[in-house]
């Protein structure tokens, strides 16, 4: 098989996970991944075998998502997150499930800029440099957005994310 396709295939699960976090909707995420892969295929001539394929694909996805968001700015800004609990080998305990839902709700309260950086660093395991390359921003900006996002997330978790306060 072609090395280019091997590289694409390797990153599809990561692209899907990030797309689900960005769009908060399974169907929109699948569409975003498909658009990203189509764009990568159409720009195959720009791919560098020795370059960072992951950053290249995530940059494509980020740009498509940003363009779609601008184009659809009249739509509501938030959509409920679907529960992914069915994909775990063992279902989480009720306490862990509630904590996970609270964290997901708090994450959705963050500004997009902070949420994207946190997702790329924490969920995708990207380095600050890779995130900077993916989002087209300076590494220092990544660090400040990450710091502010983590602090805001911590405050939201301490205060209880809207709609998910535990009743005793």
Regions found by a protein language model. Give the residues of each.
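Arg/Lys-rich amphipathic alpha helix in sigma70-family domain 2
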Residues: 46, 59-79, 95-96, 155
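A short, charge-rich alpha-helical start-of-domain segment used by transcription regulators
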Residues: 1-17, 27-30, 41
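Internal acidic/polar
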Residues: 67, 75-105, 127, 167
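C-terminal flanking helix
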Residues: 16, 37, 111, 115, ...
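Σ70-family region 2.3-2.4 aromatic/basic alpha-helix that recognizes the −10 promoter
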Residues: 37-41, 51-74, 146, 150
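Helix-turn-helix DNA-binding motif, specifically the short coil turn and the N-cap/start of the second
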Residues: 25, 127, 136-141
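A short pre-motif secondary-structure segment
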Residues: 117-121
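C-terminal edge and immediately downstream basic/flexible tail or linker adjoining helix-turn-helix-like DNA-binding
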Residues: 2-6, 133-134, 151-168
